[in-house]
Structures are given as structure tokens and as C-alpha cells.
Design a protein with these regions (language model features):
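Structured aminoacyl-transfer and RNA-binding surfaces used for tRNA recognition/handling
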Residues: 2-235
């Protein structure tokens, strides 16, 4: 576990005020995200039955927390890692038209995480999925969507600043797009995580493209799911 607490660190908000700020931020963000991307809210499962294929295998090596269900003959259930597959099933089940989608507040447990300031065993994250046409399956549409989400993030940051002026905004006006091969060429002596940290310090907000495919040095920037991530769209 790698937890770093800066010397003489002081909380900017009292614990109870922090909870109020978290609620304000989550409420504002989900409302804006829903309107911006045409998403409807759905309730997410905390666990799914084993063997259904609905749990996200992530990189294919992580083990899910599981338990038997007594009233179902001991069938195994798994706490979700993420909802990547489940969301796509729901898009079909709800017959959601192109240009519209769903979002949920996902809670999960990931026992394999390397614990630090940013990673925990407990995951609480916004998860969303949208139906698109074949024509929209391209990098330009991806970038357009990312810019829309970033705009929501910036608006949420401004809202918090208006309520708590001592929490000053830090995000740049625009998000920077960069391919992982570009990162490799620019920082060949650094590890993938170190490259991410370096480019984030440089630009302030970055969206990485091409994470799972093989790079020119024969390595991958990071692992990606073998059974549902997009490996074919040219990028």
C-alpha cells in the first residue's frame, strides 16, 4: 500500500462539510451529464450470478468477490468489478435508440487494486453507456463526447468553487488528446504510469487513446478487456 500524506497537510473542509460537498458535486454532475449526453438513470446491481457473463473481467486475470446464495441451491454470485457488459445488455433490453443511453452510480469491490491515494478496494463511480450508429464509431465522435464530458466536469468544478471559494479551480480550459505511442516516443525512459503522470503535469487534463494495443517497442501501455473493448476502430 502506498499512501502519501504531504507534510503539514491540513483539511480544506471539515469532515461533515466534505460530505455535503460530495453530495452537491455528485448531484450537479449527474444532472449535467444526463442532459449533455441524453442519458437516463438506472439502478445498478451490486452483484450478478456467476457464469452469466455479465461481470466485467477487466484484464481477464482479476478474481471477483463471490458467495453462495442459499435460497438458490448454493449458486454463486459475484460482486461486480464494473458494469461494462451489464450496461450493454440493458441498452438492448430497454431498446434505447441511437443518440441516447443510460447511466448509473456503480458500487464495486476490487480486491486486486494496488492501494494508494487514488485507488481503493471500494469503487464508487459513474458508469454510463450510449447507443451509437455504425457511422459514429470513429475517433472524432469519441473526442466530441469526451469534450462534452469535460465541459460538465469544468462546470461542476466551478460550482464547487462558488460554494467553497478556498477550493480553487485547477483544470485547464481544454482537455488534451494524446496517443499512447506518442507518449512512448516522448518519454521512452519512463514506465507507462510515469508517462501518464508526466503528461498530466504538462497539460493538466489528458485523454489517452490506444491503451490496449501493442506499441512500437512491443509493450502495451496498460491492460484492457479481451472480450469487449474496441480493438478494431482505427486510431
Amino acid at each position: 500500500m502506498s499512501l502519501i500524506i504531504p507534510p503539514k497537510y491540513k483539511l480544506k473542509l471539515l469532515p461533515e462539510t466534505t460530505e455535503m460537498a460530495i453530495k452537491m458535486l455528485k448531484d450537479a454532475f449527474q444532472e449535467r451529464l444526463s442532459k449533455t449526453l441524453n442519458l437516463r438513470r438506472v439502478t445498478a446491481p451490486l452483484f450478478v450470478l456467476s457464469g452469466t457473463g455479465l461481470n466485467d473481467d477487466l484484464n481477464g486475470s482479476e478474481r471477483a468477490v463471490s458467495f453462495p446464495i442459499a435460497d438458490m441451491g448454493g449458486r454463486q454470485a459475484e460482486v461486480v468489478h464494473s458494469l461494462a457488459k451489464w450496461k450493454r445488455v440493458k441498452l438492448g433490453a430497454y431498446d434505447i435508440a441511437p443518440g441516447f443511453g443510460l447511466y448509473t452510480d456503480m458500487n464495486a469491490i476490487r480486491t486486486h487494486e494496488e492501494l494508494d491515494n487514488l485507488h481503493s478496494l471500494y469503487v464508487d463511480q459513474w458508469d454510463w453507456e450510449k447507443t451509437i450508429t455504425r457511422e459514429d464509431r470513429n475517433v472524432e465522435y469519441l473526442k466530441k463526447t469526451v469534450k462534452s464530458i469535460y465541459k460538465v466536469i469544468k462546470e461542476s468544478e466551478s460550482l464547487i468553487y462558488a460554494e467553497f471559494p478556498h477550493i480553487t479551480p485547477t483544470l485547464p480550459d481544454e482537455i488534451t488528446f494524446i496517443h499512447t505511442e506518442e507518449l512512448l516516443q516522448e518519454y521512452p525512459r519512463l514506465s507507462p504510469k510515469e508517462r501518464e503522470a508526466a503528461v498530466a503535469r504538462r497539460y493538466g487534463a489528458v485523454f489517452l487513446i490506444g491503451i490496449g494495443q501493442q506499441l512500437s517497442d512491443g509493450t502495451r501501455h496498460d491492460g484492457r478487456a479481451p472480450d469487449y473493448d474496441d480493438w478494431t476502430t482505427p486510431n
